């Protein structure tokens, strides 16, 4: 598979760092959105149900 490599290790590490940061931000936004949605309208009922 070495003939398929067209990026250097340094480029791969740079891409990985950018990808990891973007993924972390994406997950963080999703978590905040879920917390806000839960505060607005919980999707798992309590003991008394949704009533």
From Swiss-Prot:
Molecular function via GO: bacteriochlorophyll binding; electron transporter, transferring electrons within the cyclic electron transport pathway of photosynthesis activity; metal ion binding
Record keyword Transferase present: no
Name of one Pfam family that matches: LHC
Gene Ontology cellular-component terms listed: plasma membrane; plasma membrane light-harvesting complex
Single GO BP term: photosynthesis, light reaction
Keywords, ordered alphabetically: Antenna complex, Bacteriochlorophyll, Cell inner membrane, Cell membrane, Chlorophyll, Chromophore, Light-harvesting polypeptide, Magnesium, Membrane, Metal-binding, Transmembrane, Transmembrane helix
Record has Membrane as a keyword: yes
InterPro entries: Antenna_a/b, Antenna_beta_CS, Antenna_beta_dom_sf, LHB-1/5, Light-harvesting_complex
Residues involved in a bacteriochlorophyll binding: 16, 34
NCBIfam families listed in its UniProt record: pufB_517_ASD
Protein name, as recorded: Light-harvesting protein B800/850/890 beta-2 chain
Organism: Halorhodospira halophila (strain DSM 244 / SL1)
């Amino acid at each position: 598979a070495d003939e398929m490599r067209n990026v250097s290790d340094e480029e791969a590490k740079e891409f990985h760092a950018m990808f990891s940061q973007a993924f972390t931000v994406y997950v963080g936004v999703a978590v905040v959105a879920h917390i806000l949605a839960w505060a607005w309208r919980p999707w798992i009922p309590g003991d008394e149900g949704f009533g």
